[in-house]
Amino acid sequence: VPSDSTVSLAKLTATGTKSSSTFLRGDNTFAEAGGGMTLINATSGSSNVTSITVDNVFTSTYDFYKIFMSFRVSNNAGYYLRYIKADGSDRTSDYINLDGRLIQNGTFEDNGASGPVSTFYFGRNSGSDISSLQSSHEFTVFNPFLSSTQSTITNDGVGYHDGINNYLKIIQANINTNVESHRGFKIVANSGNFNPYSIKVFGVTNA
């Protein structure tokens, strides 16, 4: 044994798999690090599309998900989300929306609650008269894959309100009251096109 009481790894017989994603525990086993997020899907484009489909991202592997998205929409169009059900069809009903917006001029636009309706409407527009602005959103999605619970989303977003001509902070929650499994989602423009767009989906690692 060296004078500093250390033992080289070469002299240890550890169980498990040594890799860049594991660490050596005190009981001499290699294990995956807990916590953090795992990138599941990255979707982006720079040509006109009227909708963006992100399918087969919700599974039994994760309970919670983070979705980051940024895009521009032509025609000052609003946009909405629909879940993709386990059979591949769109969920077109039973969305309850809770909606508030903090406007740059200091006012708070309380849009209250709406629903049940056919979509989760989450964006006014991207401020198409401001060429450098994109609408950006961070979704937290809870239990979308479970067939025994309602799927819920919170939205923390920023964009532009063309009717008021001011930037806005978007604060939302959405509940789909159908108790069913969802495997993905679709973002759809009311009119016009998305271009450019970028969406990344992460699974929150179960402890």
What are the language-model segments listed below?
Residues 1-44:
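Fibrous stalk/shaft segments of extracellular and virion attachment machinery
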